[in-house]
Swiss-Prot record:
This is S-adenosylmethionine:tRNA ribosyltransferase-isomerase. Monomer. It comes from the Bacteria. Belongs to the QueA family. Pfam families: Queuosine_synth. It comes from Klebsiella pneumoniae subsp. pneumoniae (strain ATCC 700721 / MGH 78578). GO terms for molecular function: S-adenosylmethionine:tRNA ribosyltransferase-isomerase activity. It catalyses: 7-aminomethyl-7-carbaguanosine(34) in tRNA + S-adenosyl-L-methionine = epoxyqueuosine(34) in tRNA + adenine + L-methionine + 2 H(+).
Length: 354
């Protein structure tokens, strides 16, 4: 399959730079997987689409202020984007500089350059950096870091983004990008879902900056997926198995929840799904056999991205590309701060190719 099979024309004006005033007031495009039928509505319609006993699986990662500015002690500006926190002192990061720092180089970070750090080693495209500070990494980032808005949100981060680019249920700091499908759920909607009898479970996948990396090969089978850390604890496994046993659906909120659950299913030897605490490089594209997910809540993704491939593997290629065409015609808002989709599984998708 060619990467270009997943291209579509998107007017710049449809890229959302700010979220809706109310989280749950965005538009919702529903795609019926088996038939391809589309219905238009608002996000709160999700209440009517879920049945008592259905299981919603959320990603409870929390975005860290992962973008740092500063300079090398030897001169030259740098921009640091944390990929992951290794421990209380060390990070793995992308560093933009006119000349990459060498091992042992001292970095001065923050607007006042008050935070000192040392570049320890290079691991491919990533740099291992150690902070020379008493405070733990997370405290330093909260003090001097900027929210790492995606590259297509073409504006500086604002104080409001610290709340807006964050789900209301995120409790596990470590992501450098929000699991954006979850941004649409506010407390009143969560309360109504609970009152209806919808079950909820939480996985953790710390979204890395690699999620924004373009696919740089022509044939998608040759693409190597970036690695991200995911946790699917025993209580999630139990909740999934219980939902299936009573004939209910497992609904993933966001592609990161999909990738967490499907990674746990792949790792399970003789069960549908087993606990998973590891890095995952799962790459889902047409031809993939879904194990766990029955429905999906997700935002609109970038052309030629691994995420539109994941959706195509779930709903079917033709149904997905048609839904995106209609979304553009109907002026839905795209990407992280944009509108959402509710998609049910298409059992025929596995045999469909572009």
């Amino acid at each position: 399959m060619r990467v270009t099979d997943f291209a579509f024309e998107l007017p710049e004006s449809l890229i959302a730079h700010y979220p809706m005033p109310e989280r749950s007031s965005c538009r919702l495009l529903s795609l019926d997987g088996p038939t391809g039928a589309l219905t238009h509505g608002t996000f709160t319609d999700i209440l009517d689409k879920l049945n008592p006993g259905d299981l919603l699986v959320f990603n409870n990662t929390r975005v860290i202020p992962a973008r740092l500015f500063g300079r090398k002690a030897s001169g030259g500006k740098i921009e640091v984007l944390v990929e992951r926190m290794l421990d209380d002192k060390r990070i793995l990061a992308h560093i933009r500089a006119s000349k990459a720092p060498k091992p042992g180089a001292e970095l001065l970070l923050g607007d006042d350059e008050s935070i000192k750090a040392t570049m320890l080693a290079r691991h491919g495209a990533l740099f291992e950096v150690e902070f020379n500070d008493e405070r733990p990494v997370l405290e330093i980032l909260n003090g001097i870091g900027h929210m790492p808005l995606p590259p297509y949100i073409d504006r500086p981060d604002e104080d409001a983004d610290r709340e807006l680019y964050q789900t209301v249920y995120g409790t596990r700091p470590g992501a450098v990008a929000a699991p954006t499908a979850g941004l649409h759920f506010d407390e009143p909607l969560l309360d109504k879902l609970r009152a209806k009898g919808v079950e909820m479970a939480f996985v953790t996948l710390h979204v890395g900056a690699g999620t924004f990396q373009p696919v740089r090969v022509d044939s998608i089978e040759e693409h190597t997926m970036h690695s991200e850390y995911a946790e699917v604890p025993q209580e999630v496994v139990d909740a999934v198995l219980a939902a299936k046993a009573r004939g209910n659906r497992v609904i993933a909120v966001g592609t990161t929840s999909v990738r967490s659950l499907e990674s746990a299913a792949q790792a399970a030897k003789d069960a549908l799904i087993a606990p998973f605490f590891d890095d995952t490089q799962i790459f889902i594209y047409p031809g993939y056999q879904y194990q766990v997910i029955d429905a999906l809540v997700t935002n609109f993704h970038l052309p030629e991205s691994t995420l539109i491939m994941l959706v195509s593997a779930f709903a079917g290629y033709q149904h997905t590309m048609n839904a995106y065409k209609v979304a553009v015609e109907q002026k839905y808002r795209f990407f992280s701060y944009g509108d959402a989709m509710f998609i049910t599984y298409n059992p025929q998708a596995i045999s469909e190719r572009p």
